[in-house]
């Protein structure tokens, strides 16, 4: 669910699952947006990860109160953005999947009060 060059876009109570990788392929992407807010959303098994903040025009974006289960490839991707706020989310992460994506993670991000739980397998079995 990706807005592009939007001002104050709001995404609430959505589900994104099983997206496939094509350079990115995450559930959510504040792509060059100003003030995008994602809250109370659910994502699972997206090959590109959970959320991306894309390019230097991606400013003042917030990702809060969301649940990510078994997203892959790196959960967060701050890609060239000057700021992003990620707070009070629940991330259920498979062993070996990094919190920050290995590629496209050269932006800035502030993390606050997020819950990260390691899971054993794709079915969500806890370790």
Give, region by region, the residue ranges found by the protein language model.
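Short, T/G/N/S-enriched strand-turn elements that build extracellular solenoid repeat scaffolds
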Residues: 53, 79, 100-102
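Hydrophobic alpha-helical segments
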Residues: 58-59, 101
């Amino acid at each position: 669910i990706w807005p592009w060059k939007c001002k104050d876009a709001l995404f609430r109570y959505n589900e994104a699952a099983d997206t496939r990788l094509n350079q990115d392929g995450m559930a959510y992407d504040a792509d060059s947006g100003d003030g995008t807010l994602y809250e109370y959303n659910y994502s699972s098994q997206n090959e590109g990860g959970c959320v991306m903040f894309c390019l230097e025009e991606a400013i003042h974006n917030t990702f809060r109160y969301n649940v990510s289960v078994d997203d892959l490839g790196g959960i967060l991707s701050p890609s060239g953005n000057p700021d992003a706020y990620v707070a009070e989310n629940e991330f259920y992460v498979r062993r070996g999947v990094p919190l920050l994506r290995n590629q496209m993670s050269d932006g800035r991000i502030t993390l606050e009060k997020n819950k990260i739980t390691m899971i054993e397998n794709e079915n969500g079995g806890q370790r």
